[in-house]
């Protein structure tokens, strides 16, 4: 059995009120088009053809070499859109899935079941349908007394009886590929919209006494077509619930799943505890036994097992096992932390490697640095890495002790086991095993404070 797919992605999406093509709006971190394409891959299509139109280059860039593309210059209806794929698929033996690119909730399992139903029942066309409590706006499935599908009627063309029907057309179909393009040559624009309706091929097949079937979705949510921001928010809510449920089934604990935002490509190992208001985005991986506390935000990062991240932001960073971060820390892109590193309150690290068991507990900036293992970085330490034009590296050796309020002016190297005195400004190489003091000598003037206007003795 050879399968093909046609994805309809040419529309502007006027009701979205956006410069962005409708299918490129995102749901849980992926464009709607990407969600649809991933589900389509469940049927293993020999060829996928995406129909593009409005801002076509942006749409094409999302799927790139994963799909063939055809251009629909004028949007003259769904039938016209499918006609555009004729140059790619006409005459081929097999079954063709037709699906809209704005249906991000459809699952691969449902599409696979649709194809299987179509093949097993030897249909020339199979419609994916759903039962709607409020069917207004949807095309209705009209059956005869024997339950056979005889036609699909659009809302604007439906009579009073047809408008009461609750079985609706989801806009997803499977056709015998050859018969699809033969039937498309017979449809017209004689309808309320003045468009070429893809649904009109059903009546053509029925007139030829060819078999048309309908496969009913179990979950109505999968039928959602996103046409405005309200529907986009609905899709986001459903997708977020799916994602959290998937992770819970796989052994992840959520204290308040309704408040968590996790994107589609995030991976979470078992025995992770996630508190409320946590955001995980992009290609993030969370290792087993990790705890993410309230307010944590992580994007495109790897967190090693057994780590504790407390109310902190982590971007494009890699953390080894047993790391503790926060509260209120910020790990910026290019940061790597070795095993059992501690990054504490109000510490910012950017583009740096921190060796295992090193600690930077408070109020510190580490940028463009290579920090060894078992280093203590005192409170208020700053790596001065930027001169207004270029950035420079700071290298700190193993077991070094950086005193509080040290200012390290790069390029700079502090050797193994070296110590910088608190309050020092260091601008030259510090040899291994050295102590360096880079501050002014303290001067004490006894009794001098009594001369100052604010001294209590002057207010008498």
UniProtKB/Swiss-Prot annotation:
Q: What are the GO MF terms of this UniProt record?
A: glucosamine-1-phosphate N-acetyltransferase activity; magnesium ion binding; UDP-N-acetylglucosamine diphosphorylase activity
Main location per UniProt? cytoplasm
Active site location: 362
Instruction: List required co-factors.
Output: Mg(2+)
- Which cellular compartments is it found in? Cytoplasm
Where are the residues of the annotated region Linker? Answer: 230-250
Q: Which residues bind Mg(2+)?
A: 102, 227
Query: Which reaction equations make up its catalytic activity?
Result: alpha-D-glucosamine 1-phosphate + acetyl-CoA = N-acetyl-alpha-D-glucosamine 1-phosphate + CoA + H(+); N-acetyl-alpha-D-glucosamine 1-phosphate + UTP + H(+) = UDP-N-acetyl-alpha-D-glucosamine + diphosphate
Q: Name one GO cellular component term.
A: membrane
Q: Which residues bind acetyl-CoA?
A: 379, 385-386, 404, 422, 439
Q: In which pathway does it act?
A: Nucleotide-sugar biosynthesis; UDP-N-acetyl-alpha-D-glucosamine biosynthesis; N-acetyl-alpha-D-glucosamine 1-phosphate from alpha-D-glucosamine 6-phosphate (route II): step 2/2; Nucleotide-sugar biosynthesis; UDP-N-acetyl-alpha-D-glucosamine biosynthesis; UDP-N-acetyl-alpha-D-glucosamine from N-acetyl-alpha-D-glucosamine 1-phosphate: step 1/1; Bacterial outer membrane biogenesis; LPS lipid A biosynthesis
Keyword line? Acyltransferase, Cell shape, Cell wall biogenesis/degradation, Cytoplasm, Magnesium, Metal-binding, Multifunctional enzyme, Nucleotidyltransferase, Peptidoglycan synthesis, Repeat, Transferase
Q: Which of this chain's residues are annotated to bind UDP-N-acetyl-alpha-D-glucosamine?
A: 8-11, 22, 72, 77-78, 139, 154, 169, 227, 332, 350, 365, 376
Set out the biological process GO terms recorded for this chain's protein. Answer: cell morphogenesis; cell wall organization; lipid A biosynthetic process; peptidoglycan biosynthetic process; regulation of cell shape; UDP-N-acetylglucosamine biosynthetic process
Chain residue ranges for the region called N-acetyltransferase: 251-460
Q: Where is this region: Pyrophosphorylase?
A: 1-229
Q: Which InterPro entries match?
A: Bifunctional_GlmU, GlmU-like, GlmU_C_LbH, Hexapep, NTP_transferase_dom, Nucleotide-diphossugar_trans, Trimer_LpxA-like_sf
What does the cofactor section's free text say about binding? Binds 1 Mg(2+) ion per subunit.
Q: Give the EC number(s) under which this enzyme is classified.
A: 2.7.7.23, 2.3.1.157
Q: Which NCBIfam families match?
A: glmU, PRK14354.1
Quaternary data: Homotrimer.
Xref: HAMAP family? GlmU (MF_01631)
Q: What does this protein do?
A: Catalyzes the last two sequential reactions in the de novo biosynthetic pathway for UDP-N-acetylglucosamine (UDP-GlcNAc). The C-terminal domain catalyzes the transfer of acetyl group from acetyl coenzyme A to glucosamine-1-phosphate (GlcN-1-P) to produce N-acetylglucosamine-1-phosphate (GlcNAc-1-P), which is converted into UDP-GlcNAc by the transfer of uridine 5-monophosphate (from uridine 5-triphosphate), a reaction catalyzed by the N-terminal domain.
Family the UniProt entry places it in: In the N-terminal section; belongs to the N-acetylglucosamine-1-phosphate uridyltransferase family.
Protein name stated in the entry:
Bifunctional protein GlmU
Taxonomy of the source species: Bacteria, Bacillati, Bacillota, Bacilli, Lactobacillales
Q: Gene encoding this polypeptide?
A: glmU
């Amino acid at each position: 059995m050879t399968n093909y797919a046609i994805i309809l992605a040419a529309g502007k999406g006027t009701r979205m009120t956006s410069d962005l093509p409708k299918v490129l709006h995102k749901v849980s971190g992926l464009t709607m088009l990407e969600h649809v394409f991933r589900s389509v891959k469940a049927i293993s299509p020999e060829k996928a053809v995406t129909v593009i139109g409005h801002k076509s280059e942006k749409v094409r860039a999302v799927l790139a070499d994963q799909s063939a593309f055809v251009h629909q210059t004028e949007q003259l209806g769904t039938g016209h859109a499918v006609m555009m794929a004729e140059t790619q698929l006409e005459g081929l033996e097999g079954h063709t899935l037709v699906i809209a690119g704005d249906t991000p909730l459809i699952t691969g399992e449902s599409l696979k079941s649709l194809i299987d139903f179509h093949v097993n029942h030897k249909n020339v066309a199979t419609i994916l349908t759903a039962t709607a409590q409020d069917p207004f706006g949807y095309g209705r499935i009209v059956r005869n007394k024997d339950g056979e599908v005889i036609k699909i009627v659009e809302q604007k063309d439906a009579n009073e009886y047809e408008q009461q029907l609750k079985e609706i057309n989801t806009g997803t179909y499977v056709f015998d590929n050859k018969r699809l393009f033969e039937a498309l040559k017979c449809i017209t624009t004689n309808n309320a919209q003045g468009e070429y309706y893809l649904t009109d091929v059903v009546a053509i097949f029925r007139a030829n006494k060819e078999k048309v079937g309908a496969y009913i979705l179990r979950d109505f949510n999968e039928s959602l077509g996103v046409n405005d921001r309200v529907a986009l928010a609905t899709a986001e809510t459903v997708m977020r619930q799916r994602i959290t449920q998937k992770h819970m089934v796989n052994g992840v604990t959520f204290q308040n799943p309704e408040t968590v935002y996790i994107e589609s490509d995030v991976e979470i190992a078992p025995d992770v505890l996630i508190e409320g208001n946590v955001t995980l985005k992009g290609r993030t991986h969370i290792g087993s036994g990790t705890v993410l506390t309230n307010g944590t935000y992580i994007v495109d990062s790897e967190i090693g097992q057994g780590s504790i991240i407390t109310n902190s932001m982590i971007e494009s960073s890699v953390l080894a096992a047993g790391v503790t971060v926060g509260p209120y820390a910020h790990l910026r892109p290019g940061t790597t932390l070795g095993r059992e590193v501690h990054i504490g309150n109000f510490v910012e690290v950017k583009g740096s490697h921190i060796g295992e068991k090193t600690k930077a507990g408070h109020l510190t900036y580490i940028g463009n640095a290579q920090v060894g293992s078992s280093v203590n970085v005192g409170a208020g330490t700053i790596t001065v890495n930027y001169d207004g034009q270029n950035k420079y590296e700071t290298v700190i050796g193993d077991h070094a002790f950086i005193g509080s309020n040290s200012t390290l002016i790069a390029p700079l190297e502090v050797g193994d086991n070296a110590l910088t005195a608190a309050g020092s400004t260091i601008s030259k190489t510090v040899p291994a095993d050295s102590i360096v003091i880079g501050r002014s000598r303290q001067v004490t003037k006894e009794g001098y404070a009594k001369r100052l206007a604010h001294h209590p003795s002057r207010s008498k």
